[in-house]
Amino acid sequence: RLTIFMILFAVTGYFYAQTARVQVIHNSADAAAEFVDVYLNEDLLIPDFGFRTASPFIDAPAGVEIVLSVAPAGSTSVDDAIYFAEVTLTSGETYVVVADGIVSASGYNPAPSFGLQIYPMGREVANDPANTDLLIHHGATDAPTVDIVETALGAGTIVNDISYTEFAGYLELPPFDYTIEVRTADGSTTVASYQAPLATLSLEGVALVVVASGFLDPSQNSDGAAFGLYAALPVGGNLIMLPTSASTARVQAIHNSADA
């Protein structure tokens, strides 16, 4: 599927002297959008684009207005689209595009509308080949504004007050194995804790997009996919689930018994 996407983008881009680089990530947890068709203008670019998958970075026409449309899988033409966005990409720029939100009329609470979130200044590799660069995106429809706090190495708050649909700028991190907690913005509640094993996975020099995905309360959202953090590689494919980590506390033991 991704190969077809790359070929069609290459064919379409052939007619344009200016191009931009684009990666698309499917992060809409609505069951009605589990698989979608993506169009550029009237051309079908990627059929059956699955939830929690990403395209590779590809060349797209720049300097002219294009229409990106999303239709249910199995669509017959762009006329079946349930969403479209008119965009003009900047030549030479790199973009990350994330699909979030709900298309169903009922069964989801809350139910923000489906949309494409577009981040310019994307990266295909880390700025420093000795680091791993992480772009964080909040795409969980029922999750509040949160902080992301690193606890294993004492880095503390690495993302502050990120809300649904927002991106935090790239974090340029040494490739260590981290433990990160997703906390409510006031710090009172830890939503979940995850491992980010950058060293174990040998991710030095790599730029990743990490998305908050799924539902904190599936029972209010048609028993949909549970909340988690997922990473998209520059080469695309299935998103990588960050493993959960049991929350820990710092403890000091003091021996104060006078019994001989």
Predicted features and spans:
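Sec/Tat signal peptide C-region and signal peptidase I cleavage site
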Residues: 13-17
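Sec-dependent N-terminal signal peptides
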Residues: 2-11
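Intrinsically disordered, low-complexity polar regions and short flexible loop motifs
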Residues: 18-260
